[in-house]
Amino acid sequence: KEVENQQKLANVVILATGGTIAGAGASAANSATYQAAKVGVDKLIAGVPELADLANVRGEQVMQIASESITNDDLLKLGKRVAELADSNDVDGIVITHGTDTLEETAYFLDLTLNTDKPIVVVGSMRPGTAMSADGMLNLYNAVAVASNKDSRGKGVLVTMNDEIQSGRDVSKSINIKTEAFKSAWGPLGMVVEGKSYWFRLPAKRHTVNSEFDIKQISSLPQVDIAYSYGNVTDTAYKALAQNGAKALIHAGTGNGSVSSRLTPALQTLRKTGTQIIRSSHVNQGGFVLRNAEQPDDKNDWVVAHDLNPEKARILVELAMVKTQDSKELQRIFWEY
């Protein structure tokens, strides 16, 4: 009977990369002071025995680092491994445990590059497993519940945190000290309650099986950097980043991706000498950058990031510039993804 039950359950692979969900503190009172990336995947799985009721689960340690240290090479390595597993007939869904600092970047990268409709779920925690009221175990349980559910297919890469199912494209970390840290400007896709998924909306942008980007065809990514704008900003950082090899600069601007009059000449010159300029917004609750509203984007040959924050804009530009250097094509890609 146990064998029959296992045959009925979905097969889910948990790929572990480190982060707070694999962290440990000196005492149970340490919810914010701890060392990330200490606990291995087998111990994570053993800590949630209820996973066996949801799926046939096996784990694999892909890397063991804090997510602020993840590089483009790490993203490519992870993406290629996920793609290999997604191609396997005996894998129904994949969960990736990840640090929360750059979880939103990895989720969006995978959303753009994995040509599969199988459920891919990225999950983390805001507290280490050693802390009182740790959130990692339930987050992992919810992630496996979503990944093992056929209704999760075709919805792009998902993120499960704090009982919510978020789109990997839309979600971002909004605070660093609370468990309800991950929000989407346009709201969650759904909720998980006691292992059952409830869906409220679908992603509107191109992703996964409808994406023109394929992780299997990408071996390297161009250097793209982010420069932060503020009152009394100077052009020093922008020029330095371009001089040090940035093929594109994400302008993390105020408001509508606004460009200070002190910056405009430098950004115009950088664009004329070959550096792509992408205007984004660093407002807290989600920017929405309009083209040619205040800045003459057509005249300056600049690109706008639409509703993507600077971090996600960087991911999309890196992938887009593998295919094209044309600013009009880059803008088309921003509208569609």
Swiss-Prot record:
PROSITE patterns: ASN_GLN_ASE_1 (PS00144), ASN_GLN_ASE_2 (PS00917), ASN_GLN_ASE_3 (PS51732). The keyword Protein transport does not apply. The active site is at 20 (acyl-ester intermediate). InterPro entries: AsnASE_II, Asp/glu_Ase-like_sf, Asparaginase/glutaminase-like, Asparaginase/glutaminase_AS1, Asparaginase/glutaminase_AS2, Asparaginase_C, L-asparaginase_C, L-asparaginase_N. GO terms for biological process: asparagine metabolic process. It catalyses: L-glutamine + H2O = L-glutamate + NH4(+); L-asparagine + H2O = L-aspartate + NH4(+). Keywords: Hydrolase, Periplasm. One of its GO terms (cellular component) is periplasmic space. The keyword RNA-binding does not apply. Its main location: periplasm. Substrate binds at residues 67, 100-101. Disulfide bonds: none annotated. Belongs to the asparaginase 1 family. This is Glutaminase-asparaginase. The gene is ansB.
